[in-house]
């Protein structure tokens, strides 16, 4: 605890000095990008300070999440390229970045200890951190022109994986974080095209493959523990969307490597916007249930991204590259279409369950000759799923037997009984279950026999539906159990 508090205090002071150095860089370079980075760092700094002070003053501290420090470290490394001419700013930025990563690592260890981290989660967490540290060292030891953008992207995509397996979250979040780490591994493989030595190429390729392997390990571990009938639908839905995001990330990266045309700025913006939108929907659905709206939005955004990729693929000179990218695009389109069909199927099943909410077990009515333990196989005495309603019965009400007695003639209802009648919501189908005494059953067949086996029972000038079964003839007349429907007038 003392070590963690020491590093937090050291990180806060280093970041304050870093703000001063970055402000000098903003003044000297007049860069909008640097000013925006400084603004983001200020927001994250204030949020981290707020949680840090609450943790210090509380008896049961809840330490800030390490993603604050990770993003700040990425921004600091991004600004490191702008300060190569100033040794003071260079040293300040590097020190702040290292302190941010170390403090983030210690904070994650604190979270792991508090949550009683399991062994496999600890192995995944340690391996992930080793991959990220090696990736950072590879980027710092090389002088690539555009390498700074790929390390923040890969680090940001790796943060959900670290957070999910360090705090032992639910299966949906673990699955999404594993897919995110696979995409981070794909982004880590981009520097392979920029490496000038075999050591750099081998290191970057090893980092990429290690991240992809850890991501698939997380998916298998999550499915092994959470693959239960109640969650199979949403997990399959998230797996299909994860396949869409993985293939589209790979397609975008390959297009960035192989594309040689300069006038594709509009297509790049379209691809970037679609990917960001897809990731936002994907993360949002990991915390919520799948819905028809999000599934359709995901389908539209995925097809828009596919259309932009197809136009860029047609501009490539190599036939082999076009063939590989076309195959990946077809796989992405298949995944996106399947997730759209699946979310429509899940919504349809949910709607059927919602409409059929009237299918519930009703209380059984016993006669004087029966007791509570009497059990006969008469279908009318144990009705669970009633027959389909006629189309003109849309808003029936639930009438208890003490309110209405059709066997002795209907009476006018007073105000209290009307309130009891209209107590249920109008969209719920209800039934009035009564036992008619002195009823005469019609032995004549129905003029229009129904497949459900229903016959007409005449009661004092009225009619009631009864389920006709093979055992009905053996039951006494006073044991008949009718289902009488009363439509709302």
UniProtKB/Swiss-Prot annotation:
UniProt keywords, alphabetically: Host cell membrane, Host Golgi apparatus, Host membrane, Host-virus interaction, Membrane, Signal, Transmembrane, Transmembrane helix
InterPro entries linked to this entry: Herpes_LAMP2
One Pfam family in the UniProt entry: Herpes_LAMP2
Topological category with respect to the lipid bilayer: Multi-pass membrane protein
UniProt-recorded name of the protein: Protein K15
Function: Plays a crucial role for reactivation of the virus from latency, early viral gene expression and virus production. Modulates host signaling pathways including activation of MAP kinases c-JUN-N-terminal kinase (JNK), ERK2, and NF-kappa-B resulting in the activation of AP-1 and NFAT-dependent gene expression in B-lymphocytes. When expressed in epithelial cells, induces the expression of several inflammatory and angiogenic genes. Also interferes with B-lymphocytes signaling through interaction with host LYN kinase.
Residues passing through the membrane, by range: 29-49, 63-83, 89-109, 121-141, 148-168, 175-195, 200-220, 237-257, 264-284, 296-316, 324-344
Signal peptide extent: 1-26
Main location: host cell
Subunit structure: Interacts with host LYN; this interaction modulates B-cells signaling. Interacts with host ITSN2.
Superkingdom field: Viruses
A GO cellular-component term linked to this record: host cell plasma membrane
Covalent S-S links between cysteines: none
Cellular compartments annotated: Host cell membrane; Host Golgi apparatus, Host trans-Golgi network
Upper lineage: Viruses, Duplodnaviria, Heunggongvirae, Peploviricota, Herviviricetes
């Amino acid at each position: 605890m003392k070590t963690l508090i020491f590093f937090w205090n050291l990180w806060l002071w280093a970041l304050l000095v870093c703000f001063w150095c970055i402000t000098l860089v903003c003044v000297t370079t007049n860069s909008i990008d640097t000013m925006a980075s400084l603004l983001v760092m200020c927001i994250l700094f204030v949020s981290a300070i707020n949680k840090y002070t609450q943790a210090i003053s509380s008896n049961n501290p809840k330490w800030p999440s390490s993603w604050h420090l990770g993003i700040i470290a990425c921004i600091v490394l991004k600004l490191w390229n702008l300060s190569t001419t100033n040794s003071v700013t260079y040293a300040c930025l590097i020190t702040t970045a290292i302190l941010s990563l170390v403090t983030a690592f210690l904070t994650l260890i604190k979270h792991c200890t508090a949550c009683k981290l399991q062994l496999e989660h600890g192995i995944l967490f340690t391996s992930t951190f080793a991959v990220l540290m090696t990736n950072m060292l590879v980027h710092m030891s090389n002088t690539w022109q555009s390498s700074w953008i790929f390390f923040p992207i890969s680090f940001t995509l790796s943060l959900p994986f670290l957070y999910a397996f360090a705090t032992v979250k639910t299966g949906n979040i673990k699955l999404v974080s594993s897919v995110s780490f696979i995409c981070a591994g794909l982004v880590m493989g981009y520097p392979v095209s920029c490496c000038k030595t075999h050591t750099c190429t081998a290191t970057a390729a090893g980092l990429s493959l290690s991240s992809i392997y850890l991501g698939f390990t997380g998916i298998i571990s999550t499915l092994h523990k959470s693959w239960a009938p109640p969650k199979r639908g949403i997990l399959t839905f998230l797996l299909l969307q994860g396949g869409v995001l993985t293939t589209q990330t790979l397609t975008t990266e390959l297009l960035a490597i192989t594309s040689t045309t300069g006038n594709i700025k509009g297509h790049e913006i379209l691809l970037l916007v679609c990917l960001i939108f897809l990731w936002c929907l994907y993360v949002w659905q990991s915390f919520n249930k799948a819905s028809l709206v999000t599934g359709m939005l995901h389908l539209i955004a995925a097809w828009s991204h596919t259309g932009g990729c197809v136009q860029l693929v047609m501009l490539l000179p190599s036939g082999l590259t076009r063939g590989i990218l076309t195959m990946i695009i077809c796989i992405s389109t298949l995944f996106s279409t399947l997730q759209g069909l699946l979310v429509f199927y899940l919504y349809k099943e949910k709607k059927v369950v919602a409409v059929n909410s009237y299918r519930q077990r009703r209380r059984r009515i016993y006669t004087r000759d029966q007791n509570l333990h009497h059990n006969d196989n008469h279908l009318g005495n144990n009705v669970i799923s009633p027959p389909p309603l006629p189309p003109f019965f849309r808003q029936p009400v639930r009438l208890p037997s003490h309110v209405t007695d059709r066997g002795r003639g209907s009476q006018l209802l007073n105000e209290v009984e009307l309130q009891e009648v209209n107590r249920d919501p109008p969209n719920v189908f209800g039934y009035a279950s009564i036992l008619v005494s002195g009823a005469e059953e019609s032995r004549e067949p129905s003029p229009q026999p129904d497949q459900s086996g229903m016959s007409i029972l005449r009661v004092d000038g009225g009619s009631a539906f009864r389920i006709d079964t093979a055992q009905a003839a053996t039951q006494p007349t006073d044991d008949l159990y009718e289902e009488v429907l009363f439509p709302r007038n």
